[in-house]
Amino acid sequence: MRVLIAVLATALAGLVIAAPGASAQTGLTGVEASSTGLISDEGFVSLGTTLECAVPTSGATLSATLEQENSGGTSSAFGFGGHDVLDSFCEPGGSPMAIAFGSPEPPFTRGPAVVSMEGCAGGECMTGEETVQLRDGGRTVHASVPADAQSLLELGVSSRAVLETSGVVTLGTVIDCASVSGPAFSGTLEQRQGKRLSEATVSAFILGGCGGLHPEALSFTPVAGSPAFEPRKARLSLTACAGPAGADECAVVEARLKLIDAD
C-alpha cells in the first residue's frame, strides 16, 4: 500500500530577517515558527513552522536549531523540513512545514527555548530567530505492529497536539523502520461540533529512507468548509507504511488526542 503526501504544520509570529540581496518581488517573503512545541515521551520535539512566498514556488526547505538552557545545561537539536515530496511547496499566504527535533543530552524540558531558522525558496533565503514555549506532549500511543515485521517496526503518536492560530494541527509521531523509501503517512483528525464535524487531513511521503526510532512531525490541514477545531479532544486515525515498492508494511494508530492552543 503506497500512501502519498503533504506534511503540513503551522504557525505564526516572530522575527524575520531577509538575507542580503533578497527580493520581495519573487521567492521567499517570510519564515515563522509556532509559539508552542511539544515534547514527546521519548524526548523529541515537534514544532510547526510556516514559509511564505510572493508567488507559488517549489523546492522550499527549512533548517532549524532548537536550543534551551535548563538545569541540566544546554540542550540543542537540529531539524529539517522540505524532505517530503509535496511539503517543499511555498505559496502566498503561507505554507505550513512541520519540523521534528531529536532528543539531545541533556534532554529538553518544559519552558522557553530558542529556535533559529533558515528557510530557502526560489534561490532566496531568510533567517529568523524566535522564542518558543516547550510543553508536555503527553504519553505516546502506539500502533499494534506484528512481531515478524521486517520494514515497519514501531509507530506511535503523542496524545497531545498543537492547535495553531492558522487552524492547522501539528502532531508529533515516532517511527522505527528499515526501508529504502518512505515512510508514508495518511490520516484524518475529527472533532464533533454539535451536528457538524470538524475534519483535517494529512498525506505525507518522506524522502531519504527510514532508519531507527526517530521523530516525524505532521501537520493536519483543515478540510475546506469544515468548522474550526476547538482546544479539546479530537479523534485521530493515522496510517504509516514503509518497505520496498509494492511490498509495504503498514500500521494504524487510532487515538483520542487533546488539542491545546498555541501559547
Mark where each language-model region is.
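Hydrophobic beta-strand positions in extracellular immunoglobulin-like domains
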Residues: 50-53, 66, 101-103, 119-121, ...
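Secretory targeting and sorting signals
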Residues: 1-24
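Short glycine/proline/serine/threonine-rich loop/turn segments at secondary-structure transition edges
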Residues: 103-114, 224-235
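Short, surface-exposed binding/anchoring microloops in extracellular/periplasmic proteins
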Residues: 28-71, 148-194
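Short proline/glycine- and polar residue-rich coil/turn motifs
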Residues: 84-95, 205-215
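Short beta-strand elements
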Residues: 124-147, 246-263
